[in-house]
Regions:
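Conserved adenylate-forming
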Residues: 38, 45, 167-257
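Nucleotide 5′-phosphate-binding alpha/beta core
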Residues: 1-114, 120-160, 210-217, 236-237, ...
């Protein structure tokens, strides 16, 4: 089954992202208000949970004054929370229990992520093609500094060896995103490998040294670990690019890396 991807929507969103990047504070604030109004209208109409949760609260009430919700409350009423009645928590749990389905489209049109449950409540998150287009556009246009000479000559990373270092084996956002990327770009299936952070550090270092990636994607905490290994001479390669996500990258951590 093909991964969730709409090239026309991606093109449209990319143009919108570029336009927003040139907008002033007033225009951005107006855009935010309009989008929030559409979002509230949609969830009140299509989500039973939010229709009850926001009952009696008019659209003029500011976002900061809306009653908050918790992940526990949302997951407890998942089937009422979603806006598509075809989405059912029991079915989604069966889908995320299948490791062979990582990165595959659910019902032919959704990307599904799960959280590890570090807050004692695992979450299930469903993304449609419109959402993925926004993620893809932001990743492509705002993730990094302006393109270097290397990237202009190789925008598809054909000459690179890419490595994702993270938690594997589940439908976690980063792992699903990497698998989806591989499916969308077949040339990356051999040049983009994944390495589990749950293995002993010595084994991870040995595996990375054997592969010698030129680009590493990982979490800031893992990037610090790898930087420390490089500092003591254990890593025998020097990547040209390091991508981080999933956690906040503070200035002190950035300097250390």
């Amino acid at each position: 089954m093909a991964p969730v991807f709409d090239p026309y929507r991606l093109a449209s969103v990319s143009l919108d992202v570029l336009a927003a990047g040139r907008a002033g504070p007033g225009a951005l604030a107006a855009r935010q208000r309009a989008r929030l109004a559409r979002l509230r209208e949609t969830i009140v109409r299509a989500s039973r949970f939010y229709r009850e949760h926001l009952a009696g609260i008019g659209p003029e009430v500011p976002l900061a004054e809306l009653p908050p919700v918790t992940r526990q409350a949302l997951m407890a009423r998942f089937d009422d929370w979603v806006t598509d009645p075809q989405l059912r928590l029991a079915d989604l749990k069966a889908f995320t229990a299948d490791p062979d389905a990582i990165g595959q489209a659910y019902l032919g049109r959704y990307v599904v992520w799960e959280s590890s449950g570090t807050s004692h409540q695992p979450g299930v998150f469903v993304q449609d093609a419109a959402t993925m287009a926004v993620y893809d556009a932001l990743e492509a246009l705002r993730r990094s500094a302006p393109l270097s000479t290397q990237r202009w000559s190789d925008p598809l990373y054909l000459s690179e060896r890419l490595a994702f270092v993270g938690v594997l084996g589940g439908h976690f956002a980063s792992h699903v995103s990497i698998e989806r990327l591989r499916q969308l770009n077949p040339w990356m299936r051999r040049s983009f490998r994944s390495f589990s952070i749950l293995q002993p550090v010595a084994e991870l270092v040995e595996a990375l040294n054997s592969y010698a990636p030129t680009v590493i994607a990982t979490y800031p905490t893992v990037a610090v670990l790898l930087a420390d290994e490089a500092r003591r001479g254990a890593l025998r390669f020097r990547p040209r690019e390091l991508w981080t996500g999933g956690e906040t990258l503070g200035s002190a951590v950035r300097r250390r890396i």
